[in-house]
Amino acid sequence: MSDINATRLPIVGILGLPCIGDDVNSTLTHGEDLC
């Protein structure tokens, strides 16, 4: 359980960034930060 939580925490943090928002897919595709 601890491994799963540790893996999801950074993902949730990245997806939760206001500067990325719903453009996460395009950001990951282009590999650029919208910030």
Curated annotation (Swiss-Prot):
<feature type="propeptide">
    <location>
        <begin position="19"/>
        <end position="35"/>
    </location>
</feature>
<dbReference type="InterPro" id="IPR027582">
    <property type="entry name" value="Amanitin/phalloidin"/>
</dbReference>
<protein>
    <recommendedName>
        <fullName>Cycloamanide F proprotein</fullName>
    </recommendedName>
</protein>
<comment type="similarity">
    <text>Belongs to the MSDIN fungal toxin family.</text>
</comment>
<dbReference type="GO" id="GO:0090729">
    <property type="term" value="F:toxin activity"/>
</dbReference>
<feature type="cross-link" description="Cyclopeptide (Ile-Pro)">
    <location>
        <begin position="11"/>
        <end position="18"/>
    </location>
</feature>
<feature type="propeptide">
    <location>
        <begin position="1"/>
        <end position="10"/>
    </location>
</feature>
<dbReference type="Pfam" id="PF24112">
    <property type="entry name" value="Amanitin"/>
</dbReference>
<comment type="function">
    <text>Cyclic octapeptide that belongs to the MSDIN-like toxin family responsible for a large number of food poisoning cases and deaths. Cycloaminide E is structurally related to other cycloamanides that are non-toxic to mammals but show immunosuppressive activity.</text>
</comment>
<keyword id="KW-0800">Toxin</keyword>
